[in-house]
Amino acid sequence: GTARYQTIQNNFSLNNRRFEDELAQTCRKEGVSLLPYSPLGGGVLSGKYNDGQLPDNARFSRYFKLNEKRQLTMAQRFINEKSTESTKRFMAIAADIGMTSVTLATAWSKQHDFVASTIVGATRPEQLDEILAAADVTLSAETLNRINEVSREILYPMG
């Protein structure tokens, strides 16, 4: 016979929680875990795109400058009014509990029963430090409730 599927790979972040509504229950039932990628929502959850900023050498900054339909559509999916507003709120939650939004987003991603591990990416050592700081973090019920409140108020920031 063929090997059984063990995991699937989907985009999953504080700004893209569709997996919870669309596939999580089936994955639990079938014993298939999620290997999420883009836990920082393409870097948006770091706050680097807040207030209309387009940092040099950032992927979506290049996409906006190229102004080509495919790249522009992707950039607008990740960076829009809803995603930057939710990011600001998540950053405030992170600050309240003494961590960066990068650490918060990574910790949140790995704290789901259907997640096997989380695919992360970094271009600089200090980015990796913030990501790896989430390894031993377990977010409190209060923090998770605050996160869920933002997600209810700003439903599906990435569409």
Question: What name fits each language-model region?
Answer:
Residues 1-149, 154, 158:
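Beta/alpha (TIM)-barrel catalytic core signal, keyed to glycine-rich beta->alpha loops juxtaposed to Asp/Glu
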